[in-house]
Regions:
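Sec-dependent bacterial lipoprotein signal peptides
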Residues: 1-20
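Non-catalytic accessory regions flanking glycosidase/transglycosidase catalytic cores in CAZymes
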Residues: 50, 56, 62, 74, ...
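Extended ligand-binding clefts on enzyme/binding-domain cores
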Residues: 131-166, 194-199, 237-242, 254-260, ...
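Internal amphipathic alpha-helical repeat/solenoid segments
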Residues: 152-200, 208-222, 226-254
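Short glycine/serine- and small hydrophobic-enriched flexible loop segments
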Residues: 205-213, 264-275, 331-335, 412-419, ...
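Active-site-adjacent structural elements in enzyme catalytic domains
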Residues: 220-231, 253, 267-271, 283-296
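Solenoid-like repeat scaffolds
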Residues: 492-501
Length: 524
């Protein structure tokens, strides 16, 4: 079903709609997108290989919805007893589990104190939860990163506090209690509207895990978001989440899925298992296994081994070979392979990295022979040997084959994977993107706009300083030391951008990127 985007956007369908490019209500008949209204996130001032996949698990029963408003979400940061480790990277003798060599975060006497937000009777754990302290607390910098990667210039304390400060603002603006006590969701409309989508839910669950050690409510929030996910199953694949809910916590616009949301929810559950263990109120590992198996069964192309748009998108659907490039999540596919032992996830990983390279080398070449590294929002033919940019109007609108708010997330997804895995197949496309971005901007992030053709021509009317573009480029710039000045300029632009200047999507991608930029991420 095709999303009908809000008119309050620039030049075309969606870059500032603050929305997911993943509205996927269930198709009727031939399975293309149906007409429906997309959620407009609004500004913050809106007071508003073909192994047989595993059989899906039995879905949980929908929980009864009531009107409890849930707890307040305010957070105050206070010093933690245990100091964090400095973000300076030093080589570690042991390589990472998958590819490349990792670097230990090291130690520093002046690293300051980890932010352990506020006070809480249960120290941030849900009832019957496991250990009181997370394994990878915010500010602890315990993840080893690939040798040669960099961070913005500045003290660890300053980077941490910038990320922590924006987390507090983001939480106040977007985190909302669900209709049943103890449940939570991320509002896609800013301060007051209750509408949400599964993409936002996946982002929010990852954010909650990464905020452990900063926010004493992090685990309770995560478990509440997990409960909200369970209350909104897809009709076709009940272990997966229906893509769209309204303020009354009812699934709307077709109870089908959006693949990117499910991928992030599954990954968040693996992170939670690593962060807190699975012996508490929620068995995160078991929940992750169920959803990973369902994704492989319903949302990965059976022969093309690439993510489909949704659980309705399998062959013979006309969109079966359509790739939403923001679904390129190599760190997720890598983690799913390691966790399940399912070889097919290795094929999905290989296919994803191949598709990025094929789109860059085949379609981003300029007249002088150099590559911009830009990829389209949507590609067709992902179920065949070589994908190609979607034609205008193929799925969402006129810019389906251009680089806008969907493809803008690819540098972030590739970047976080390279930070932890060091896979050279991610580094090569990152180098292309970094070279192009430094050149087109002349080192000034304000010269980067929100949309381009694949050969680097700015789209008419595309605004500057968009966080959905700049924040992912900053994560990409972490890949190599020769990007340091460019990375520092991007970091300055990111920190300076007020939350009121962006909508849900830009602010949420900004926060997730700031966790990576301050080295407050980890791999499952």
């Amino acid at each position: 079903m095709r999303r009908a985007h809000s008119e309050r956007v620039w030049w075309a369908p969606a870059i500032l709609a603050g929305l997911v490019g993943c509205g996927n209500p269930s198709p009727s008949g031939d399975a293309g997108p149906d007409d429906h209204t997309a959620i407009d996130a609004g500004p913050s001032t809106d007071t508003g290989a073909d192994a047989r996949p595993s059989t899906d698990a039995t879905p949980e029963t929908d929980a009864t919805v009531n009107s409890d408003a849930g707890p307040s979400m305010d957070v105050t940061v206070s010093p933690d007893a245990s100091p964090p480790m400095d973000a300076t990277v030093t080589p570690d003798a042991s390589p990472s589990a998958d590819a490349g060599t990792s670097a230990d975060a090291g130690t520093s006497a002046d690293a300051g104190t980890s932010a352990d937000a506020g006070t809480s009777a249960d120290a941030g754990t849900s009832a019957d939860a496991g250990p009181l302290r997370p394994t990878f607390p915010f500010g602890g910098h315990r993840q080893r990163f690939t040798v040669g990667t960099i961070a913005p210039t500045g003290t660890t304390v300053a980077l941490d506090e910038a990320a922590a400060s924006f987390y507090r603002a983001w939480k106040t603006m977007y985190l909302r209690p669900g209709c049943e006590a103890g449940t939570f969701y991320v509002s896609t409309a800013g301060a007051t509207s209750g509408a949400t989508v599964s993409e936002a839910h996946g982002y929010g669950m990852i954010i909650a895990v990464l905020a452990a050690g900063l926010d004493p409510e992090a685990r309770a929030i995560f478990d509440g978001m997990h409960a909200f996910y369970l209350q909104h199953p897809s009709e076709r694949s009940p272990v997966l989440m229906a893509w769209n809910q309204n303020a009354a916590c009812m699934s709307i616009n077709g109870r089908t899925t959006a693949t990117d949301g499910d991928l992030d929810i599954a990954y968040a559950l693996l992170l939670a298992d690593r962060q807190w263990g699975s012996d508490g109120a929620v068995n995160y590992a078991a929940a992750a296994r169920r959803i990973i198996e369902a994704i492989l069964r319903f949302e990965i192309h059976p022969t093309g081994q690439s993510p489909m748009l949704a659980d309705w998108g399998a062959p013979p659907n006309r969109y079966a070979g359509t790739l939403r490039t923001s679904d390129t999540m190599p760190d997720h596919f890598r983690a799913f392979r390691a966790f399940t032992g399912e070889a097919r996830w290795g094929l999905v990983l290989d296919t994803a990295l191949f598709h990025v390279d094929a789109l860059q080398t085949g379609f981003s070449r300029r007249m002088d022979g150099t590559l911009t590294g830009l990829v389209p929002d949507f590609a067709t033919g992902a179920d065949t040997a070589i994908p190609r940019p979607a034609a205008a109007g193929w799925y969402e609108g006129a810019n389906d084959g251009n680089f806008t708010y969907i493809a803008a997330r690819v540098p972030w997804r590739l970047g976080v994977d390279y930070l932890s895995a060091g896979d050279p197949r991610a580094l090569t496309p990152l180098r292309r993107l970094n070279t192009w971005a430094r050149e087109v901007s002349a080192g000034d992030p304000a010269r980067i706009v929100g949309g381009y053709t694949l050969v680097g021509t700015a789209l008419t009317g595309a605004p500057a300083r968009e966080m959905v573009v700049l924040a992912p480029l900053a994560v990409a710039a972490m890949a190599e030391a020769d990007n340091q000045r460019w990375l520092d300029a991007l970091w300055g632009a990111i920190v300076a951008r007020p939350i009121t200047a962006e909508r849900y999507l830009g602010n949420t991608v900004k926060l997730l990127s700031m966790f990576a930029l301050s080295r407050n991420t980890f791999a499952p």
